[in-house]
Amino acid sequence: MTALDSSRLLQPRTASVHRRTGETDVQIHLNLDGSGRHEIDTGIPFLDHMLAQLSTHGLIDLQIKAIGDLHIDDHHTNEDVGITLGQALAQALQDRRGIHRFGHFWAPLDEALVQVVLDFSGRPHLSYGLELPTERIGRYETQLVREFYQAVVNHAQLTLHIRQAAGLNAHHIVEASFKAFARALRMAVERDPRRQEGIPSSKGVL
């Protein structure tokens, strides 16, 4: 390994993305090699709570500020935060050189149990298996959970499978999914010391 390669391995993987549309204005800064520090304000309290889980359990430093047309509903802001987060993940990983690529985790929360398996494959695909018993958690529409994950998947270009093994409380189920996603994400983006700067694909590209 060259000195340049060694230097690259030591550099924190960060990204800053600003997405502005006629509906929302979203700014995200993240550090994949962080400690779980976060400042999050999307205007959607439940989404803020879930993103805090992602940061804390994924050890991703995360700053998110979103302003959206919440007077209409939460849909545009929820989706655009997912889009911007996916873009930030893709930017931080660049060509995905030297990472483990795959991640998986089971997360319990009381009666809920959720599994997440993911692959930074470059091929966006979501297999979503959460069965949420209520239409809302507080004011947050539970159908927006899938929309958030789909937005992340499309723009981070990853394959994501979410499976619910148990759960009765919608809040517990969704939170377990975010915790499992965080830990699977942490596993997948970890640098692989054996691979060093190699691309984790037999094709040589992701």
Swiss-Prot record:
GO cellular component: cytoplasm
Swiss-Prot/TrEMBL catalytic activity: D-erythro-1-(imidazol-4-yl)glycerol 3-phosphate = 3-(imidazol-4-yl)-2-oxopropyl phosphate + H2O
Keywords: Amino-acid biosynthesis, Cytoplasm, Histidine biosynthesis, Lyase
Gene Ontology biological-process entries: L-histidine biosynthetic process
Enzyme class: lyase
Primary residence: cytoplasm
Pfam families: IGPD
Residues spanning the membrane: none
GO molecular function: imidazoleglycerol-phosphate dehydratase activity
Pathway: Amino-acid biosynthesis; L-histidine biosynthesis; L-histidine from 5-phospho-alpha-D-ribose 1-diphosphate: step 6/9
Assigned EC number: 4.2.1.19
Cellular localisation: Cytoplasm
Region Disordered, annotated ranges: 1-21
Record SUPFAM superfamilies: Ribosomal protein S5 domain 2-like (SSF54211)
Family: Belongs to the imidazoleglycerol-phosphate dehydratase family.
Protein name: Imidazoleglycerol-phosphate dehydratase
Species for this entry: Synechococcus sp. (strain JA-2-3B'a(2-13))
Gene for this chain: hisB
